[in-house]
């Protein structure tokens, strides 16, 4: 018609040419639409219903082939039935979209990845070939599968992708094959067509994403295994144009998490069971069962053998497995077999690898981790947990432990509770069960609380985590915990029945134990924990022993701390605490701890201070032992002198000095014996030595404080204080209070004392010492106790200095030089008598710590020697006693020579001496026949107005003394009063009480005592 129309019309008319052109365009458009429709019909025909065949895999076009992502492979045997189960479906995390074209190069910088997981579950009528391995009693194979089908699967994945990762495991008890695969699509693949194919057959990938522009793409199966998609806008293809360009969604669509079970016929399987445990994700929230329409494939691979594309490496390994995980590391569990009590079914891992590339960064988000943790919590809330599901959860937690710490921190406490709940709700029939994964190991033991024996849990080989319940633990353990047999002795009666199982956990990575409050401390070990049926176990009579290897070797000169994870710290977020734990032994690669409770344990390295080098430690050790030895000798001489010569120990200060010297002597002797006793490593003996060392240290501190208290009475109270049985009460306080403190510590737990290592000598020998093991006990009963005494003594020391300054103002100019020397001697004597040198310990840190440690070691270990110098050798009355009874010849002093001289010249030379003597730091009286060690009035025959040896040192005060029955009273105006007393007033029990009634120095006798 068109042609004939042309006969009757002028050929060159423009209207006709335009009409012809339009008609031609319409025809071309119809042809394009027709071709597109035919292609869509072809794809639909592939998915037409059929009861005799099933979909098991997808075949995309290879590079350079037209779009065939919707074509399906394999016509399957009609007689064999199987179930294809999509165990888990994750929310699709897609890629940035382009609106013009749909190939991968426009969407991603490299490739798109799809991850899927399927379970082949055979029906009862399916013949399963089982090969019994008589050597080890395990099943060497579950399914007898042909190499042809394996080749078909390999070819399918190779055609679909540049590289892929697949791992399958067999479970004998369930007669299933579980496979997880990850495919890296070719760059020329049509993404939308691939998505349409997945949606049509109702199978979604577990994950769907592309490489992040900031990170390189995986290029090997190992990297594909660790791939986690970065959350981006998902791919959204137009509904009416499934092959058209994808659209970018502003928000991620919510894809329901479901388990889709499809009953189809299949004769496809793997040639061999695969040696890798696959982790089946947690219990799904929705289960859907449907019959898939069977497609009519255009390329039936089952009809002819297919040749595998060349691959570069195949990794095959075998290990007894039944747990499911899509990680490369082996996972162990125990699932009973129908024919054997606890079979261990070997599996085989097949890895098709390509040239290795760069590592992919974990790109999960908090919402992803939150969803996975919530799923596990929901499954645990249902009650009893079967071993296979427990193994899956352990593997899931193990995988989450490698998430970025910043993302994992908000969920750390919940994950710890999930791990505890797994062991608490685990249902098993045997006595013990253990579940291991690459980063987490869990073991549960059934126990009888009334008959509990010592139990040990150990973990081995961090690269292939294994557990052991042998006692003692294996030598190659990276972490072990030993529970004493007395663990449950103190449980309440209603808790004994509940204590039916003990759970052990081992964390290969400390991701769940991040403490932001740590400043100069860092975790250097693995983490191990133990619990008894989710009960609180503390204040044990015998401590738990924990041995942990260091992740990296630590130098011997660094300080470590044994700590446990306290859930209540940092506002409920958890944190490390050392309460109840102490270091028992430290080596370069391992630390052994003892703790009085059960929880999660670890080792912290103290970076705040660096310990001294071994050579410095050796020098300080020698100084300490030499100083203690010298002090012991001279303290003994001081004690013998004051005990042997009755005339120099009649006053109260001398008696107080005797008690202090006795305490210091016993302290030094026990300290010298301590290291030698520690070599025998006898627990009871070592505890006894530590107890006595603690006791005599507190006694020494207490008597130093009593010296200061006596000075307070002499200076402040003066005449107005009288204390009956003065020394007896001092003895009760000085020896009794330390005994009460030590008794309380022993009552709480004898294990607060024990052997500990305090460094090493240059030859590597450990410096073991019997001392306090608990930091809490040490800081309260030693540091706190000493701080109180030290503050009292420093205050008293300042008061004495003030008094010396007042006295010096009243001195005549000619005598100042002499009194200045006496003042210095008095100050030095008080410094050692009151233990002021112990204050060097407060400065033994920072850049000057070495200097002050040497000062501390020298002055404190020689405290006994300095007491001998200032309170024996420097005292004139003591030297006279030595000359009278110990010397001979010209050095010997006549027994009554000093008494006659004093009687003749005493009245002529009496002057008020307001200086402080070098031996007693007190005012000297000219009536000093024996020159005793009173603190402020230095007179052997001094009458103490209050019965305590007190005398006034004020401007109008009065000092007095007794000489051979005569009492000499001196006021500061130089007047002298004499009276007779028939009783010996030099015995410290004067019957005269005096009271100052005016500032002029007048005295009144108020009563006789």
Curated annotation (Swiss-Prot):
Modified residues (Phosphoserine): 1002
Outcome, altering residue 617 to A: Impaired structural change induced by deoxycorticosterone
MF annotations from Gene Ontology: G protein-coupled receptor activity
Major localization class: membrane
Site (Cleavage): residue numbering on this chain: 598-599
Region (Stachel): 600-611
Protein name, UniProt field: Adhesion G-protein coupled receptor G2
Gene: Adgrg2
